[in-house]
A protein has these predicted regions:
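Active-site beta-strand->loop->alpha-helix modules in alpha/beta enzyme cores, enriched
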Residues: 1-40, 44-169, 196, 213, ...
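Amphipathic alpha-helical coiled-coil segments
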Residues: 221-225
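A conserved mid-domain beta-alpha-beta active-site/ligand-binding segment of alpha/beta enzyme cores
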Residues: 177-178, 182-202, 206-220
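Short, well-ordered beta-strand micro-motif
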Residues: 183, 234-236
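Carbohydrate-associated surface elements
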Residues: 173
Length: 256
């Protein structure tokens, strides 16, 4: 068996190109795009540049923030209502693009795993009412539990609907399998400006610098002048096997 597996690997390796870049994602025109963000600012960190380009393509975009953001200021830099502040930041930033009326589900920040049944019902209702053509969510490889819970709720409803829409996972804290890239060089300055408007998170992490670094790293794979900096956002196209492998892997983790 080991010899056979070794033979398969050798055949595969010899057929690989010297360097293989992910494909560039062709963005739709005038379609309905639904974005699920575990927390305020996740939508901009993960796919803000792509949302800017989709809005320029006259797409109708709905952003859903699932947690209430109450745990977003543990050191109490902000003296007012943290939940209201984080929601107002989201409204302001999305309003710059003309994305109005973001939906806030107000599940407990950091506690989505304790409300999975309600989370799935809420995701399903919004999903079905909006009837999207494209859906963006966090990935199963995230290191934040809330992010994985959102990926779980969205992906399982997508499966139940028969996988009719394109479902793409963006990256925040966990790297993903890069199936697609979107060149966001033309809107990177806008993305940086929008990230700076989320004041509370910036007290804890320099998300602007982090976003620039990740986008520039992903931009290495964008074809173009190697002497000019390119910026990109990466996406994983979720497939049914990804969902089942994740569930199986987590079950085995619990058994072990």
């Amino acid at each position: 068996m080991n010899r056979f597996i070794d033979w398969l690997w050798v055949r595969r390796l010899r057929r690989l190109p010297h360097f293989r870049s992910p494909k560039m994602l062709g963005l739709p025109q005038k379609q309905r795009v639904l974005v699920f963000a575990p927390h305020s600012d996740d939508e901009w960190i993960g796919c803000g540049g792509t949302l800017s380009l989709l809005k320029a393509n006259q797409c109708e975009i709905r952003v859903v923030v699932l947690s209430d953001g109450a745990q977003g200021d543990p050191s109490h830099f902000f003296e007012g209502d943290v939940k209201k502040k984080r929601q107002s930041e989201t409204r302001e930033v999305l309003g710059v693009l003309g994305i109005d009326d973001p939906c806030f589900l107000n599940f407990p920040d950091g506690g989505l795993a304790e409300h999975l049944a309600d989370l799935r019902r809420a995701v399903a209702q919004i999903y079905d009412e909006f009837a999207p053509d494209w859906v963006f969510t966090t990935s199963f490889t995230e290191h934040h539990r809330d992010h994985v819970c959102v990926a779980y709720a969205v992906a399982h409803h997508w499966l139940s609907r028969g996988r009719r829409e394109r479902l793409l996972a963006y990256e925040i804290y966990g790297s993903i399998r890069v199936d697609w890239l979107v060149d966001i060089t033309s809107v990177m300055a806008l993305k940086r400006d929008m990230i700076r408007r989320y004041e509370i998170p910036l007290h804890y992490v320099d998300y602007e610098a982090a976003c620039v670094s990740v986008a520039q790293f992903r931009g290495i794979l964008v074809a173009g002048d190697p002497l000019e900096a390119s910026f990109a956002e990466a996406f994983m196209e979720i497939k049914p096997l990804d969902v089942w492998l994740d569930v199986f892997g987590r079950a085995m983790d619990r058994v072990g």
